[in-house]
Amino acid sequence: MNYPELSMNTILGKLFSVFAFAMGVPAQDIEVAGALMGKKMVVNEFVAYLDMVHLKATLDPKTIAITSFALCGFANFSSVAIQIGGIGELAPSRRSDLAKLGFKALIAGTLASYLSATLAGLLL
């Protein structure tokens, strides 16, 4: 099977476009903003910000503002691994508790960033 139009950006754009829509991203930029938010979650925020810099000329200013807030934060899978590894060394007996809380912390951090982005979208 060969699907050249199917990429990580396309999949993440479709999945996270719901959040971009809810935050108030203009309709023409929803999928691009969703792809950036998904890339932040899967890879990290630095890669997503670098991609956004290259798209800056094509995006609506409101999209840039909302997406900047949505990308701000360390809620991604690599940060959860760093948390488990770093704090797990300080308290090795609690490593399983950290692993259980890692996903919840990821969701909470993501929702906090998305709430800030939504408020920015309301005020713009």
How would you name each of these model-derived features?
Residues 1-56:
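Transmembrane helical segments that form the transport core of multi-pass membrane transport proteins
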